């Protein structure tokens, strides 16, 4: 792979990773420990490897059929997660809130990585480029998720108890933006 071929992949990786960064800002406003932040970032990175790989395997011919559906599903998942965070921060006390682990973490990671499925569909299967592409997508998304989570964690300290509500609203807003781009 030449440098000229790598540049568009790096740009795509950052574009896909910005979803993870944006929603991680909101998720970071939950009371997360550094270990959880590391785990969340790795999970998002893994999903950003798996989803485009699945898309590449299915190939370019499915891109038009599932591109809009994948985009819609990702937006709905983010909106649902955002409402859940707002709901849990209002109705539950600090001790009973669930951390983003288990199924909620997988829903979150799936939601921010579903767009990479569509990108994988459009890229198709290109041998060695497939490996480089999916590893690049995963690494950049993991890195941007960590940055977003850490910034969100810092912002929560400044916002106090309302930080989690703001984080949920950010997720809902981002999901609505995906549904109704300005």
UniProtKB/Swiss-Prot annotation:
Spans through the membrane: 6-26, 37-57, 71-91, 101-121, 131-151, 162-182
Pfam families per record: Mntp
Keywords recorded for this protein, A-Z: Cell membrane, Ion transport, Manganese, Membrane, Transmembrane, Transmembrane helix, Transport
A Gene Ontology cellular-component term: plasma membrane
Biological function: Probably functions as a manganese efflux pump.
PANTHER family associated with the record: MANGANESE EFFLUX PUMP MNTP-RELATED
Protein name: Putative manganese efflux pump MntP
Source organism: Bacillus anthracis
